[in-house]
């Protein structure tokens, strides 16, 4: 705010020379306010009628102006005179303060005779864009608008080690058939150029892909899965009908040798009009590492060869994955798969009518375990329909927030177990 440019009040007019001296009447113990000469060069003093008298002011009829200030002026004043002078000074200070407050002080509320002050607002740091799939910050905002693509990744012994899993944003793990697990790996901002091996689809993997509005890359599927893909409007990227987006490597025998890249998958998505994905993301948060209470984690999904183990890494606040007693690594980078969040969803598990394929009751609700920041939180998962997103709540019914980064979700049958130790 600007100070009011109005001129202050005119100084008080000095009295005429003949009026500057007032007689101090000792009879009524009152003293008028001494005032300096107009030119400010002289100081008013009191003349003594009799220097030997006990009271130097007793016979004063008129004060005498002395051009030289005597050094012991205040010592020659009585206590009462000093009090009177102090009171006058205090009154002047108070009066001056009141004049400033009510007359000279700028009026912030008044728009009259004021100049608006233009204050440059400090630029608020712009929030960085984040991935809807993983919650991680992105260097390029356009990556957040990429379509989500899901790929069915095999996990048999002949398929290990796989390629591209370290780049997946979310991975769902469940049994395909015969106790052999399979992964649905979802990608958005990350674009690995060597992914596989890719295998066939199952109905519950479709239920995991639908809430993310994801394209589904697969090589055929069970009869029920193929019917669901057609009837539920899944974005179908089946290798059977889109072979230009896939290839087979010679280092592995069929059917463990189908691979793809995002250069090819992006072109396939574009050709089908799958340019973005609209979905409800999981609620994310920043890491808040705790004193570890759940560092060694085991899920009894199937036999030991397919039951994963996760070991908490305090340095990176991640969980290193192993299976069959061997570190689970990416074939392309050699890096061990290390998600930020590990989740076990407990579901009723059964057998399909063909007596071969596995089924899961993946709608409704059930118990869940969330491992992040070195601790475990027990809560509830809920999914109202095949197309709807999973909702994760804690023991108080509040939405559970997940660390930003890769999230690994294992489906654990209700007859199996989840174990963890500090």
Task: Please describe what each predicted stretch is.
Residues 104-126:
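Ser/Thr/Pro/Gly-rich low-complexity linker/stalk segments immediately outside membranes or between
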Residues 76, 80, 94-112:
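Hydrophobic single-pass membrane-insertion segments
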Residues 79-88:
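Short, hydrophobic alpha-helical membrane anchors of single-pass surface/secreted proteins
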Residues 1-75:
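N-terminal targeting leaders characterized by basic, low-complexity, disordered sequences
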Residues 88-94:
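Hydrophobic alpha-helical targeting segments used for export or membrane insertion
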Residues 71, 81-82, 118-170, 177-422:
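A surface/extracellular/periplasmic glyco- and lipid-processing/surface-interacting theme
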């Amino acid at each position: 705010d600007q100070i009011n440019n109005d001129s202050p009040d005119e100084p008080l007019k000095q009295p005429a020379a003949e009026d500057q001296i007032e007689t101090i009447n000792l009879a009524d113990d009152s003293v008028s306010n001494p005032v300096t000469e107009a030119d400010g060069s002289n100081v008013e003093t009191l003349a003594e009628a009799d220097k030997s008298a006990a009271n130097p002011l007793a016979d004063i009829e008129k004060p005498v102006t002395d051009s030289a200030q005597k050094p012991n002026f205040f010592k020659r004043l009585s206590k009462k005179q000093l009090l009177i002078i102090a009171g006058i000074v205090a009154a002047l200070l108070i009066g001056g303060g009141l004049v400033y407050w009510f007359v000279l002080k700028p009026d912030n509320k008044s728009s009259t005779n004021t100049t608006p002050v233009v204050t440059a607002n400090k630029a608020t740091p712009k929030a960085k864009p984040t991935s809807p799939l993983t919650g991680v910050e992105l260097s390029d905002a356009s990556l957040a608008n990429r379509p989500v693509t899901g790929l069915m990744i095999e996990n048999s012994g002949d398929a290990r080690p796989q390629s591209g899993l370290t780049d997946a944003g979310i991975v769902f793990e469940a049994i395909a058939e015969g106790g052999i697990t399979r992964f649905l790996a979802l990608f958005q901002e990350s674009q690995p150029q060597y992914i596989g091996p890719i295998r066939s689809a199952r109905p519950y993997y479709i239920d995991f892909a639908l809430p993310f509005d994801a394209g589904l890359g697969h090589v055929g599927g069970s009869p029920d899965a193929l019917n669901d893909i057609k009837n539920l409007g899944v974005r179908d990227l089946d290798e059977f009908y889109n072979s230009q987006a896939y290839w087979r490597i010679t280092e592995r025998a069929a059917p463990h040798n189908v691979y793809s890249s995002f250069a090819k998958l992006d072109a396939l998505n574009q050709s089908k009009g799958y340019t973005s994905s609209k979905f409800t993301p999981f609620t994310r948060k920043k890491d808040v590492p705790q004193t570890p209470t759940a560092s060694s984690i085991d899920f009894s999904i199937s036999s030991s060869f397919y039951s994963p183990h996760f070991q908490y890494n305090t340095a990176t606040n991640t969980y290193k994955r192993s299976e069959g007693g061997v570190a689970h690594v990416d074939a392309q980078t050699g890096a061990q798969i290390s998600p930020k969040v590990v989740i076990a969803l407990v579901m009723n598990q059964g057998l399909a009518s063909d007596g071969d394929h596995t089924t899961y009751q993946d709608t409704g609700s059930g118990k869940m375990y969330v491992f992040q920041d070195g601790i475990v939180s027990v809560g509830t998962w809920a999914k109202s329909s095949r197309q709807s997103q999973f909702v994760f709540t804690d023991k108080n019914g509040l939405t559970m927030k997940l660390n930003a980064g890769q999230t690994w979700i294992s489906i654990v049958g209700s007859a199996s177990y989840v174990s963890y130790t500090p």
